[in-house]
């Protein structure tokens, strides 16, 4: 069972947390994170999940978790930054058990702000590759997405493409589009360049890359793919699952957009293609720590990984899980296995570089 709690309902949280959901009272916030979980007969366990992901497939997955464990999921949705600020403002009495969000940048900020507590779990350490999780067990990636070059098949040949760095070449002038520098996916990508190439080289790259823009940054990844498909530009950088959605759409027009666009994995002869994650961690003041850990372990289990791969067009973190057929059609690729935790300190210089280069 997934109980979605409205944003307005939580705005009145003060030093104590009491909220009625239907006929149930949630009043476990005073419990220590390490305290044992009550096992009163007939009393259903529950966790409060703060999530910035807004996919219907996720709700189905949470219902599967409840069916398997008996633990109800109270879902509180919001934008990532809003949820981070809410948890901080709620302080020691925060009802949040789990914070789930997209992108390294948000996970890093949450860890830096002291929102997470460490988790030791053999399941998590086995199922999640080391480079996709915090070395201290603060957060764990549970799905991957690759940030790839997507190109108009009629205007660009794949053999013309090679690396992220090469996109600063003047031959691409007026041919490139991308979303805003305020987007966390782009910030994490540039952070990966800072780690790989250094700040000075990345600044030079960013200036060249920006000079190749066909228009000012606007729209999300889908908007970039649509513009490339229509011929407004020749190529973009976008996350793979956006293309998966278009290819799997029941709308013929959406499929047609995708069919005009090719997917190219950059840097295959070197460090590999940049990958990012949706990630999750146990909140420091979690009333139900045990239930929170069970939830995260469930997310990286084989059935959950298969469900996410097939229905949300993401790459699983668990090895051996079959991909959605449309995602599999992109081909196999080499991932950049630089620890995402190492990219965290590079986010601030990456943002500065993007601003200095004029990336709006």
UniProtKB/Swiss-Prot annotation:
The UniProt record describes its induction as: Transcript levels increase when cells are grown in the absence of iron. Protein levels increase when cells are grown in the absence of iron.
Q: What happens when the gene is disrupted?
A: Cells grow normally in the absence of iron but have a reduced capacity for Fe(3+) uptake; double knockouts of this gene and futA2 (slr0531) grow very poorly in the absence of iron and have a marked reduction in their ability to take up Fe(3+).
The alphabetized UniProt keywords are: Cell membrane, Ion transport, Iron, Iron transport, Lipoprotein, Membrane, Metal-binding, Palmitate, Signal, Thylakoid, Transport
Q: Name one GO cellular component term.
A: plasma membrane-derived thylakoid membrane
Q: Where is the lipid attached (N-palmitoyl cysteine)?
A: 29
Q: Which GO terms describe its molecular function?
A: metal ion binding
Q: Which family does it belong to?
A: Belongs to the bacterial solute-binding protein 1 family.
Q: What does this protein do?
A: Plays an important role in protecting the acceptor side of photosystem II (PSII) against oxidative damage, especially under iron-limiting growth conditions. The differing subcellular locations of futA1 (predominantly thylakoid lumen) and futA2 (predominantly periplasmic) suggest they may fulfill different roles.
Write the protein's name: Iron uptake protein A1
Gene that produces this protein: futA1
């Amino acid at each position: 069972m997934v109980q979605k709690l409205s944003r307005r309902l939580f705005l009145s949280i003060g030093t104590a947390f009491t909220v009625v959901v239907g006929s149930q009272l949630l009043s476990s916030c005073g419990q220590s994170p390490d305290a044992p979980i009550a096992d009163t007969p007939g009393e259903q366990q529950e966790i409060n999940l703060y999530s910035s992901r807004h996919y219907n497939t996720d709700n189905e997955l949470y219902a599967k978790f409840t069916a398997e464990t008996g633990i109800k999921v109270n879902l509180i949705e919001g934008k990532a930054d809003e949820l981070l600020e809410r948890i901080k403002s709620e302080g020691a009495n925060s009802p949040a058990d789990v914070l789930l969000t997209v992108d390294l940048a948000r996970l890093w900020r949450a860890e830096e702000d002291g929102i997470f507590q460490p988790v030791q779990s053999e399941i998590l350490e086995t199922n999640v590759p080391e480079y996709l999780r915090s070395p201290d067990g603060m957060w764990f990636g549970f799905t991957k997405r690759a940030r790839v070059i997507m190109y108009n098949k009629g205007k660009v040949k794949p053999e013309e493409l090679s690396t992220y760095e090469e996109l600063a070449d003047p031959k691409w002038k007026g041919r490139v589009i991308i979303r805003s520098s305020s987007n966390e996916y782009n910030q994490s990508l540039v952070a990966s360049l800072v780690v790989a190439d250094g700040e000075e080289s990345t600044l030079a790259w960013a200036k060249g890359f920006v000079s190749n823009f066909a228009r000012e940054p606007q729209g999300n990844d889908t908007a970039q793919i649509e513009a490339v498909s229509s011929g407004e530009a020749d190529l973009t950088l976008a996350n793979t699952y956006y293309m998966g959605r278009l290819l799997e759409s029941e709308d013929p027009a959406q499929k047609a957009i995708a069919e005009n666009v090719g997917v190219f994995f950059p840097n295959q002869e070197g460090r590999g293609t940049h990958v990012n994650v949706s990630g999750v961690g146990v909140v420091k003041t979690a009333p139900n720590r045990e239930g929170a850990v069970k939830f995260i372990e469930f997310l990286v289990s084989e059935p959950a990984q298969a469900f996410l791969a097939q229905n949300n067009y993401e790459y699983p973190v668990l090895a051996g899980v079959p991909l959605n057929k449309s995602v599999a059609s992109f081909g196999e690729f080499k991932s950049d296995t630089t620890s995402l935790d190492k990219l965290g300190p590079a986010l601030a210089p990456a943002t500065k570089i993007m601003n200095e280069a004029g990336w709006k």
